[in-house]
Amino acid sequence: TLSSRRDRQMTIILTPFMSCSAKLPIYAFFTSVFFPGKGALIMIFLYVFGILTGIIFALILKGSLFKGEPVPFVMELPNYRMPGAKNVCQLLWEKAKDFLQRAFTVIFVATIVIWFLQTFDLRFNIVTESKDSILAILAGYIAPIFNPLGFGDWRISTALISGFMAKESVVSTLSILYGSTQSLLMSLTTPAALSLLIFCLLYTPCIAAIAAIKRELNGKWALIVVFGQCLIAWLASFVVYHLILLVF
C-alpha cells in the first residue's frame, strides 16, 4: 500500500529484522535452559535489539542505496464499516492464492532439498543417525565460521540450516541432535547462548519470507537480503559475545 517504491523496498528489506512468532520458540527454549528466571528480560532485550538494528540499518540505507527526499505520507481515511463475511473470505482467498502461485514453487523446492539432505548420506542411503546425513556433513564444514561466536558445533550449524526452512525447526533439530538439555548446557556457555540468540534473531528469514521478497522485488534482492542478514547477524553476535567475555 506504500505509494513510493523506495519506501516499499526499504520496508521489505527491514521487516525481517523484527521478531516474528516463529522465533518465539527459540527464545523460550534458550531462556528456559540458560537464563532461568530472567526470561522476560531476555525476551525484551531481543525485541529491542532487533528494532534498534532495523533503525540503524534503515539510516544506513537512507544515506546510501536509497538516497532521496522522503515522500509525504497522506492517507484519506474512509468511513469505517463492518465488512461482510463474503467480502472477507473473497479477499483472503485472493491474497492466499496470489501467495501460493508466486511463492509455492520456491518453498516446495527448498522443502524437498532440506528433506533430502536430512534423510540421505553421501552414498544416498537412508540414514539412521542424523550425524551421518549430508546436512550434518555440510554443517561440519560450516561450523568453523561460528567458532568466533562461541557456538562452532556442527549440531548447532545443522539446526541453523534447518531454520532456513522454518525457524521453529531450530529447537526440534537441537532436541534431536543433543538428546537432552543437559548435553546442550555442557556444549554451550551462557555468553555463547546469548550470542546464538542474537544470531537467530538477525540471520536470514525463513524460505517463505525469502519467496515473498523475491515476489515483491526480485531474485537479486532476495539473495542480497539472505547474505546481508547473515553477515549482519554474524557481526552482531561477534560483538555481543566478546563484549560479554570482556565484561564478565
What residues fall within each predicted segment?
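Juxtamembrane inter-helical linkers in multi-pass membrane proteins
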Residues: 67-91
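Transmembrane helix-loop junctions at the membrane interface of multipass transporters and ion channels
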Residues: 17, 21-44, 208-217, 239-248
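Membrane-interface helix starts
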Residues: 97-109, 152-157
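Small-residue-enriched core segments of transmembrane alpha-helices in multipass membrane transport
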Residues: 16-19, 34-35, 40-57, 128-147, ...
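Extended, low-charge hydrophobic alpha-helical regions
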Residues: 1-11, 112-230
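Short amphipathic alpha-helical coupling elements at transmembrane boundaries
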Residues: 87-98, 140-148
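Hydrophobic core segments of alpha-helical transmembrane domains in multi-pass membrane transport
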Residues: 31-33, 47-61, 107-120, 196-202, ...
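Membrane-embedded alpha-helical segments of transport systems
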Residues: 11-28, 45-54, 164-171, 201-205, ...
